[in-house]
UniProtKB/Swiss-Prot annotation:
Binding site for ATP: 148-210, 232
GO biological process: 'de novo' IMP biosynthetic process
Native source species: Methanobrevibacter smithii (strain ATCC 35061 / DSM 861 / OCM 144 / PS)
Protease keyword on record: no
GO molecular function, one term: ATP binding
Described function: Catalyzes the ATP- and formate-dependent formylation of 5-aminoimidazole-4-carboxamide-1-beta-d-ribofuranosyl 5'-monophosphate (AICAR) to 5-formaminoimidazole-4-carboxamide-1-beta-d-ribofuranosyl 5'-monophosphate (FAICAR) in the absence of folates.
UniProt similarity note: Belongs to the phosphohexose mutase family.
Annotated protein name in UniProt: 5-formaminoimidazole-4-carboxamide-1-(beta)-D-ribofuranosyl 5'-monophosphate synthetase
Names of required cofactors: Mg(2+); Mn(2+)
Annotated EC: 6.3.4.23
Residue positions binding Mg(2+): 299, 312
């Protein structure tokens, strides 16, 4: 961990009233089902919301308490932290929390108990660390290029952090790479520091499945909770154009995620789906203890050889979990009732309180 020490978090947790725990999160990303799931398991809920963005949470009535801030990043301010601690809050991280609060602040300044592994958030954000987790687990991944001058076939170019696909692009040569970098910088999507940390990997042609898992530290078991695919702008609109028109216009499609839709995968591929998750969980335990505690996502492509290839991970609840707020076919198979990712998180916290094992799932 950074300057936030585990023993200090445990001391705060020891002073909490375990009969009155509040589940809290930042008002964005996946907060609707995080809070609704907490309510379904009997918890009070709280949301830290940027001024002017509270309407969805009021309309859906998912929060018992509101902490309104000028900017999302204010969640790390001491007065906000104290309000959370006074509520006996356990904070659930998600992509927007990481992006707005900032990893340095989460590691060094945010002295509020968090569900899951605080340390692993940096491992998903930094491409080399993310890749190390996959390599250690011997998970099938795309080939990586160390320098744009080596590009000799179609590649996907990505950048650090939780961006929702913004700035990603495909290139087939060093010249095309440089041209598209210049265009992205002109749009204000990239800075020189981003370019220096560009992640270049082979473009895998296949169907996209974002696979959502939950690792229970209490039961030492990986659960498959759901899958989704993405609506991405502008590539989804671009591919609906006739081929002639695509060739005639000078457009570089972007891959900005604008929404998600649920998916199921061919049943014969499920052994690969479980195996790759089990491998990743074990490598995470080894490289960044206590590992992938709670929700995580493996973003994959399935090629025409029916190989499931992982190109990215999320080490916390992923935006695609919004597709199964009322449960998915896979969570139904496990639980026989509606089970969202938010509810599964709350259930883990509830079980940990009963077993007096909160320290296993909190950092």
């Amino acid at each position: 961990m950074g300057e936030v020490k585990l023993e200090d978090i445990f001391e705060i947790l020891d002073n909490y009233d375990k009969d009155n725990i509040t589940i809290a999160t930042l008002g964005s990303h996946t907060s609707l089902h995080i809070l609704q799931g907490a309510k379904e398991e009997g918890f009070r809920t709280a949301i830290v919301c940027e001024k002017g963005r509270e309407v969805p949470y009021q309309r859906f009535d998912v929060a018992d308490e509101y902490i309104i801030v000028d900017k999302f990043k204010d969640i790390v301010n001491e007065d906000v932290q104290q309000k959370l601690r006074d509520m006996n809050a356990i904070v659930i991280p998600h992509g927007s929390f990481v992006a707005y609060a900032g990893l340095d602040n989460v590691e060094d300044k945010f002295n509020v108990p968090m569900f899951g592994n605080r340390d692993i958030l940096r491992w998903e954000a930094e491409r080399d660390k993310e890749r190390a987790l996959l390599v250690e687990g011997e998970v099938r991944i795309p080939y990586k290029y160390d320098n744009p001058s080596e590009i000799d076939r179609p590649v996907m170019v990505k950048f650090p952090g939780a961006r929702g696909g913004r700035g990603y692009f495909v290139a087939s040569s060093p010249e095309e790479f440089n041209k598209k970098i210049d265009a992205m910088k002109a749009r204000g999507w990239l800075e020189d520091s981003d370019v220096a940390n560009a992640h270049i990997e082979e473009y895998v042609s296949g169907c996209n499945y974002c696979i959502h898992y939950f690792y229970s530290a209490l039961e030492d078991e990986v659960e498959l909770l759901g899958m989704d695919t993405r609506y991405e702008s502008s590539i989804d609109g671009f591919v609906r154009m006739p081929a002639k028109d695509q060739l005639d216009i000078d457009l570089s499609p972007s891959y900005v995620v604008t929404g998600n839709h649920p998916a199921v995968i061919r049943e014969s591929l499920l052994p690969q789906v479980f195996e790759m998750a089990d491998k990743l969980v074990e490598s995470a335990k080894k490289l960044v203890a206590p590992g992938l505690n709670g929700p995580f996502c493996m973003q994959t492509l399935v090629n025409d050889n029916l190989e499931v290839i992982c190109f990215e991970i999320s080490a916390r609840t992923d935006g695609g979990t919004n597709t199964f707020m009322g449960g998915s076919p896979y969570s139904y198979l496990t639980y026989g009732k509606p089970m969202s990712m938010g509810r599964r998180i709350a259930l883990e916290i509830k079980n940990a309180i009963k077993k007096e094992e909160l320290e296993k799932i909190i950092t």
